């Protein structure tokens, strides 16, 4: 789908690379048709996860090595994607060439969040808006919390799921806990270039952000910032941290939704009822 292949997508939070040199980005393969991995060497890069020799996958899950070696014929690559060596090819002429290196994909990092794509465009305006609104959050210090991960498959077109996310009229009837935690009458929606922001104002007694004076939301009892970035990325910020929701089309009437949790170290003890799950 062109609308997905030509846009930026969430790859990972840098905390997912803690202690690892490479992690497989399996969720992006279903979106983009390209096996990718995120590597941490002298810098964080998104590179192809396919060996340039015979197409074998290089990393299954994650690894912690200074080089990447193909498990099929032993071709070895650096963490910058460059081919380093291959058994029995020491005397080969004009080898290796640039064609033997792994493809490097565009990537952008913002406050610990890494985004990538095939030939993406248009994320800068979204990040500029988010920086102005929530740049005060220590998102780069959030820690990956595997226990908050979820995965659902639904019988619906991906756009129908996005439509459901973007309208709040169903909240009093479907999300009882969320409706109790938020002041429904003060629910706010703002549109910006490439996305939508919904702001949940807390009911009395609910956990809220400590918002600094320089923020446009100073003085508000904000319980959640819900960002949708076109076409299928949701970044839901709560006082406890961040829930990333990925919308992954499987067919015209099947969609997989993946949730990934990243927790602020000062709120690891909290579980709030403001999650927006299916």
Question: What are the residue ranges of the model-derived segments?
Answer:
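Rieske [2Fe-2S] iron-sulfur-binding domain
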Residues: 17-120, 124, 128-131
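Predominantly a Rossmann-like dinucleotide-binding segment in NAD(P)-dependent oxidoreductases
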Residues: 111-152, 156-162
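A conserved active-site cap/scaffold subdomain adjacent to cofactor or substrate pockets
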Residues: 146-185
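Polyanion-binding catalytic cores of nucleic-acid enzymes and NTP/SAM-utilizing transferases
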Residues: 178-217
